């Protein structure tokens, strides 16, 4: 018997990707999966891509997760904290929701509402010292999908004194799976295909998370819904502090990071190259007219932006090589 793993909230897109990764992981044994509306259904009927996975979804409650060594929480924002508080301290927990990402209760109230549950260790291993913090805890808050792409692009530039922390501007496009699996009129094919539409302009909930993780002091973020199932492409711009090669700064920061790839000069990220992988692709330059630093970041919002990153964090928590059970390469086209 390997490491016993349970997934709470297994019926959604992130939950389905978690199940795919867990069942292919050489050290993990899936012992439980839970859901609300889909409880009582076999996993392979809820997720047709998991043909032959006969485990039946249980109701989401602590008893269903009691036999697990490792629990992934893929629940809507506001639901993870209550369930996590009822799990034994020795159980390792990775929360893919937002409940434990923010340190500031006022930021939580402004962007999410409700009671602030407190902060867990932030699960972005590539930040300085973060692998060690993740390895030493039993509770990890997985970053948001947009935050993953943007923090990886921006954090090294601010940390190196190459970019000003103020006046950061981001425009990022995401596939429709980022909005979840629940039926919504604006996400049906007839609405999404052939269209680009911004949403939560100037008030996206990942803004305080990005500022917290990068040290940015002001951030203008415009998210865009793109006509594709999955993937994120973020363009991050910042004011330089000094004459600097942003690509060189990023390359040095991620020289030993197996899942972050600073592309050769002249090659720019595109989402299809990252699909199915836990990788983030980066490229950077200086705007010849405005003089601003530009970093483009691409990743799979369900992989590196959710389930893949959660497994990477779990590997570190368990003392396993962080690449175990994860792909560096995408499946394009």
From Swiss-Prot:
The keyword NAD is assigned to this record: no
The reaction(s) this protein catalyses: N-acetyl-L-glutamate 5-semialdehyde + phosphate + NADP(+) = N-acetyl-L-glutamyl 5-phosphate + NADPH + H(+)
Name of the protein in question: N-acetyl-gamma-glutamyl-phosphate reductase
Entry EC number(s): 1.2.1.38
Gene Ontology molecular function terms on file: N-acetyl-gamma-glutamyl-phosphate reductase activity; NAD binding; NADP+ binding
Pfam families: Semialdhyde_dh, Semialdhyde_dhC_1
InterPro entries per record: AGPR_type-1 (IPR000706), NAD(P)-bd_dom_sf (IPR036291), NAGSA_dehydrogenase (IPR050085), Semialdehyde_DH_NAD-bd (IPR000534)
UniProt organism field: Salinispora tropica (strain ATCC BAA-916 / DSM 44818 / JCM 13857 / NBRC 105044 / CNB-440)
Keyword set, alphabetical order: Amino-acid biosynthesis, Arginine biosynthesis, Cytoplasm, NADP, Oxidoreductase
GO biological process: L-arginine biosynthetic process
């Amino acid at each position: 018997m390997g490491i016993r793993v349970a997934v709470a909230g297994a019926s959604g897109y992130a939950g389905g990707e978690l199940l795919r990764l867990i069942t292919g992981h050489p050290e993990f044994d899936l012992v439980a999966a839970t859901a609300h509306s889909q409880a009582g259904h076999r996993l392979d009927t809820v997720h047709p891509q998991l043909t032959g996975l006969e485990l039946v979804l249980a109701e989401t409650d602590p008893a269903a997760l009691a036999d697990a060594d490792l629990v992934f929480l893929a629940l809507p924002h506001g639901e993870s904290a209550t369930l996590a508080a009822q799990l034994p301290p020795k159980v390792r927990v990775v929360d893919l929701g937002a409940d434990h990402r923010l340190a500031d209760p006022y930021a939580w109230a402004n962007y999410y509402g409700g009671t602030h549950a407190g902060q867990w260790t932030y699960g972005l291993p590539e930040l300085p010292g973060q692998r060690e913090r993740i390895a030493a805890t039993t509770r990890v808050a997985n970053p948001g999908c947009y935050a993953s792409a943007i923090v990886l692009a921006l954090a090294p530039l601010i940390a190196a004194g190459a970019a000003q922390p103020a006046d950061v501007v981001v425009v990022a496009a995401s596939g429709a799976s980022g909005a979840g699996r629940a039926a919504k009129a604006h996400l049906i094919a007839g609405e999404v295909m052939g269209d680009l539409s911004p949403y939560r302009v100037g008030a996206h909930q990942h803004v305080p998370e990005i500022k917290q993780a990068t040290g940015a002091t002001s951030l203008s973020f415009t998210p865009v819904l793109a006509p594709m199932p999955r993937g994120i492409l973020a363009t991050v711009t910042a004011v330089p502090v000094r004459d600097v090669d942003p690509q060189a700064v990023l390359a040095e920061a991620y020289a030993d990071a197996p899942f972050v790839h600073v592309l050769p000069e002249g090659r720019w990220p595109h989402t299809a190259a990252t699909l199915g992988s836990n990788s983030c692709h980066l490229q950077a330059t200086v705007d010849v007219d405005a003089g601003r630093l530009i970093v483009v970041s691409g990743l799979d919002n369900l992989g590196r932006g959710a389930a893949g990153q959660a497994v990477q964090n779990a590997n570190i928590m368990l003392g396993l090589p962080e690449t175990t059970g994860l792909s560096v390469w995408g499946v394009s086209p």
